[in-house]
Amino acid sequence: MQYLTLNDGNKMPILGYGVYQVEPAEAQRCVEDAIGVGYRLIDTAQAYYNEEGVGAAVKTAIAGGVKREELFITTKLWISDVSEERALKAFDASMKKLGLDYLDLYLIHQPYSDTYGAWRAMSRLKKKGGGVASAVSALATLMRVKLWILR
């Protein structure tokens, strides 16, 4: 498996399994199969409504001998929760659904509304612990520069 080193020093597999448009009832089986054939990066999102299935599959994999540290789990904050306080609540809700002690990467799904507030929330989560790296998907270059300055 090849990895990409993130700015915080953590390593992320360059190939992952995403569960976009995977029915919630099928997510657990699909992710179990993906982990079984060697995928270690699993990508979900609040808006996919299948975080619980992903979490159940991770628990099954760990019970079967896969170490949590081998897995790289990412989820995304949906646009309805892009503000500092709502992002913190949404993170807690995602963690509860996933049933994980920590998350490897938390993405702002799309940069609408209070992106800077959501970024501040992610910085707070990182400082609090839990191993959260943060990033923004689908983001214009100018906003990336501004967020880089805020870090």
Could you describe each region identified by the protein language model?
Residues G18-Y20, A45, T74-K76, Y106-H109, ...:
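A cross-family glycoside hydrolase active-site/sugar-binding cleft signature
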Residues V82-R151:
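Glycine/proline-rich, positively charged
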Residues M1-L71, D101, K127-G129:
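N-terminal binding-site loop/beta-alpha segment at the start of enzyme catalytic domains
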